[in-house]
A protein has these predicted regions:
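Histidine-rich, glycine-flanked metal-binding segment
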Residues: 24-38, 47, 51-104
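C-terminal helical cap
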Residues: 45, 360-370, 375, 380, ...
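Active-site neighborhoods of metal-dependent hydrolases
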Residues: 190-200, 257-419, 512-516, 520-527
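C-terminal cap of metal-dependent C-N hydrolases
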Residues: 452-509
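Active-site gating/metal-coordination segments in enzymes
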Residues: 172-222, 249-250, 275-295
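Divalent metal-dependent hydrolysis catalytic cores, especially in the metallo-beta-lactamase
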Residues: 126-147, 164-174, 195-207, 216, ...
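Metal-associated gating/positioning segment near the N- to mid-region
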Residues: 85-161, 179-185, 238-244
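Bacterial N-terminal signal peptides
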Residues: 8-19
Length: 527
């Protein structure tokens, strides 16, 4: 997915000097969360480290300030715990009994747009949905609210003066320029200027090859990261293999990968009447793209996947954002929309020729069938890449195509499971792999001594059922024969600050209800 439609108009002119959309109000000062404390001990939990190791417990996790200082096994499973084997609580400390609970690292969402004027939602709404789903770190690819705004929010989050995940601002290539970038030196100057303004990396859709190569080279020199959505307007010149060679950190979605796998053709098989600015046409034809790529075992496939692995390249597939293309009714009627999808966001989702990602003008079984086959090939490549040692991360791109913030991220975990990932591999993709791709694995991504206390606490086992991470929980038939809801995140801990996840969800429901009351409606309208 992409940022504003204005960016695409400029892409069509091969200029790519995007105009920033109007920035939304910054988040209010923090009133939520308790801590950090001189010492906080989480008692008796089962731990999922995020490294790929199996769960173990009971464990006491000791946090001092914002850091994990001890991860101590305090007994055997299903056996009494000897108090003498437990870390002592210091004066002024706090302890939380988490017997029967699970603790995992905070989720790293590698593709999280904070939203903007187009979506009509506030930063508070987005941040609280993220934190309520255990998302403690988010890369904003593009900084659609402006680099100054995004960098400011990142600083405020780092200081914990707002209720928000930690933020990693990646500026959109060319943003802030009055005119298009036309030389490699201008690209280098732009990279340096963005770093000075607080950007940690760059997001691009493509560009003239010599200019884009210079930008990637300068990013490397400046120690910055990069993300690329290889849009169709430039992918014939620069596909994922080219940008990976230039030093691209992560590819977003799937664009550029099938094109790198072409054998016997050099461009997508576009029909003669194809128009990129007709989004149903664009995404309809995209559903036929993986069928044009070389298959596993072919010489071309093996050459491409081998080189990407050798380059240490990262895939950020964002399966979730295209899920509606294979099952529109399911996406449109997801149970969380009623309470958690803001009416203004719903307006943006409604089919429209003007709102990006709202391209379901006449989307039927033929398009969905193409995309179901597309997903099979796409998922097979991603799983194969992981199995051969490649890094795969979790990104949601919510705020488009019926994807609500927070919920879309958990859907991505389920889709990685569908692709063939073991639940522990899903957890690693959602935590440590994202931290590694951001160059932040020394601080976040796993439950280890010395790392920041970014943790998620659940009353249910997410390895047995990823659905317990949804804010709406999971329906289970109780012992009394009545269906009941279980799960949902209990606490999200960021920098040692403990957030009550259900309370954050109540705040979001209140925001949504208030907007509905203003409109005089109780339900989101369906077409």
């Amino acid at each position: 997915m992409t940022r504003p439609m204005r960016c695409f108009a400029l892409l069509a002119a091969f200029l790519l000097a995007p105009l920033a959309q109007a920035a939304i109000p910054a988040a209010p000062e923090r009133n939520e969360g308790e801590g950090p404390w001189p010492q906080l001990i989480l008692r008796g939990a089962t731990v999922i480290t995020g490294t790929g190791s199996p769960a173990f417990g009971p464990v006491d996790i000791v946090i001092e300030g914002d850091r994990i200082t001890r991860v101590q096994i305090v007994g055997s499973a299903n056996a009494p715990i000897d108090p003498e084997n437990r870390p002592a609580l210091k004066q002024g400390g706090r302890e939380i009994d988490l017997s029967g609970h699970y603790v995992m690292p905070g989720i790293v969402d590698m593709h999280g747009h904070i939203g903007g004027d187009e979506q009509g939602v506030t930063a508070e709404y987005v941040y609280k949905l993220w934190l309520a789903h255990g998302i403690t770190s988010v890369r904003d690819p593009g900084c659609g609210n402006g680099i100054e705004w995004c960098a400011s929010e990142a600083k405020r989050s780092a200081a914990n003066t707002i209720t928000a995940p930690r933020l990693f601002p990646y500026a959109f290539f060319g943003m802030g320029q009055d005119d298009p970038i036309t030389t490699p030196e201008q690209a280098r100057q732009w990279v340096r200027s963005m770093k000075a303004k607080g950007a940690l990396g760059m997001k691009c859709f493509g560009y003239r090859p010599d200019i884009l190569e210079a930008a990637f080279d300068e990013l490397r020199k400046q120690g910055m990261g990069s993300a690329c959505h290889h849009a169709q307007l430039d992918v014939a010149r620069v596909n994922v293999l080219t940008t990976a060679r230039w030093g691209l950190t992560t590819m977003e979605h799937w664009y550029g990968l099938p094109e790198a796998l072409f054998d016997g053709q050099t461009v997508q098989q576009y029909p003669a009447d194809y128009n990129y600015m007709d989004e149903q046409h664009r995404f309809g034809e995209a559903g036929k793209l993986w069928a044009q790529a070389s298959e596993k075992g072919s010489e071309r496939y093996e050459a491409v996947i081998t080189e990407l692995l050798e380059l240490g390249f990262t895939l950020d597939p964002t399966f979730t954002i295209y899920q509606a293309t294979r099952d529109l009714m399911r996406a449109r009627t997801a149970e969380w929309h009623a309470d958690y999808t803001h009416p203004a966001l719903w307006d943006f989702f409604t089919p429209s020729r003007h709102n990006h990602g709202s391209f379901f003008f006449d989307w039927g079984s033929e398009q969905e069938t193409d995309w179901k086959h597309n997903y099979q090939r796409w998922m097979a490549f991603v799983n194969d890449y992981k199995n051969r040692g490649g890094r795969v991360t979790v990104g949601s791109d919510s705020g488009y195509i019926y994807k609500t913030y927070g919920f879309g991220t958990i859907e991505e975990l389920e889709l990685l499971r569908e692709a063939g990932f073991h639940p522990l591999e899903v957890m690693r993709a959602a935590t440590l792999s994202g931290a590694e791709a951001l160059g932040a694995e020394d601080r976040i991504g796993s439950i280890e001594v010395g790392k920041l206390a970014d943790l998620v606490v659940l009353s249910e086992n997410p390895l047995a059922n990823l659905k317990v991470l949804y804010g709406t929980g999971h329906i289970r038939l109780g012992e009394n024969g009545e269906p009941t809801r279980v799960g949902g995140v209990r606490y999200t801990i960021k920098d040692g600050i403990v957030y009550d996840a259900p309370a954050l969800l109540r705040d979001v429901r209140a925001i949504v209800a208030e907007e509905k009351a203003k409109r005089g409606t109780e339900e989101l309208p369906q077409p």
